[in-house]
Amino acid sequence: MKKVLAFDLDDTLAITKSPISDHMAETLSKVLEDFDICVISGGRFEQFKLQIIDRLHIDARKLSRLHLMPTCGTQYYRYDDVENDWHQLYAENLTDDEKNRVTEALEKVARELGYWPENPVGEIIEDRGTQVTFSALGQQATPEDKYAWDPDNTKKLAIRDGVAELVPDLEVRAGGTTSIDVTRIGIDKAYGMQKLIDTLDISKEDILFFGDKLEEGGNDYPVKAFGVDCLDVSKWEDTVTRLETILAVIK
C-alpha cells in the first residue's frame, strides 16, 4: 500500500487560488488517518495556509503528517507537534541578480507579446524568494477570469519560451492558470519528491501523486517523468472521488 498521497493544489485540491471546500477538508482529514499527505504547488507558504491549513480542523498528530512544498518544491515545511508551529526544512533561494534578470525578462516578453495587463488585480510579478512568478491578470484576479484567459495554454507557453531564451541559466515553467514560474534549474516538483523520499526514508513506489498538468510541458510532468505513480485529474471533485474510492478499498 502507498504511504504518501501527494497533490498539486490549484485544480487538484481546490479551485484556483481558493480555499479547499468543506468536502475536500473532511476527506483529507480522513486520508490523514492512513497516509501522509504532501502538497506541492507554485504558491507561497501563506497561500498554502489560506487554502489548506486554515480549512483543516485537525489535531497536531494529523498536522504532523502534512508535508507542504510551496513554490514548486523549492521550499519544504512540516509541523512540529511539540512546538505547535510550522518549520521550514529548506529553501532554494534565488539571488538578487537572478531575481532582477527574471523580472526584466518577464516584463519585456509579456509586453512584446501584448500580454502585459493594463488593469491588473493584484501583483503582476511576485518575488517569492525561491521563485519569481508572473501572473497575467494579477494575483487576485477571479477564478472565472483566470480560466477564460488562456484555455489552450498558448499564451503561457509563448511567454515561457520567450523568457527561457533570455534567462537560459534558470528554469522557466508554465505554472498555474495564468502564471509563469521561474526557479533555479532542476528545482521542480520531482526535486520536491526526492526531498520527501529522503526525509521519510521511503521509495518513489510508496508515493501516489494527483495532478492536473501531467502532460509533457505541464508543471506536474516532472513527477511523472521521475517515476512516481500518478493520477490525472482536472478538478478537485475528481480528486475527492478518487480519494473516497481509495478509502473505501482500504477500510
Question: Residue spans of the language-model regions?
Answer:
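A short, Lys/Arg-enriched amphipathic alpha-helix followed by its capping loop at the start of a domain
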Residues: 2-6, 23-35, 162, 199
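Conserved acidic, metal-coordinating active-site core of Asp-based
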Residues: 112-113, 117-208, 219
